[in-house]
Amino acid sequence: MFKDIITYELDDDVDEAYLLEIAGEIIESWMSKQPGFIQWDIHKDSIGEGYTDIVYWETREAAQEAEQQMGNIPNAADWFSCYKEGSIGSQNLQQLGSFK
């Protein structure tokens, strides 16, 4: 499994309800149709200022292919307008093991 970890702050004019609404639209219209997509989790930090999304993919290649297709997202401008300019960071993780 491969994970994209995206950190960000919301733009000043965006609230969490709008973020979740737009995320739902992105899932329905685009992301769920991407080969290798598993799930997208949105988290808020304990002080409520920073957000972290974890997007799960079957493989690194599936994640990279989806990234190349991001220009085809029907309402990409609405999605990207949620993020405060300059606040986005990302990293990628390859899962080695999982224990319960």
Annotate each predicted stretch with a short phrase.
Residues M1-Y51, E58-G71, C82-K100:
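Short S/T/G/P-rich N-terminal loop/turn motif that feeds into the first structured element of a domain
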Residues I73-A77:
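A common structural junction motif
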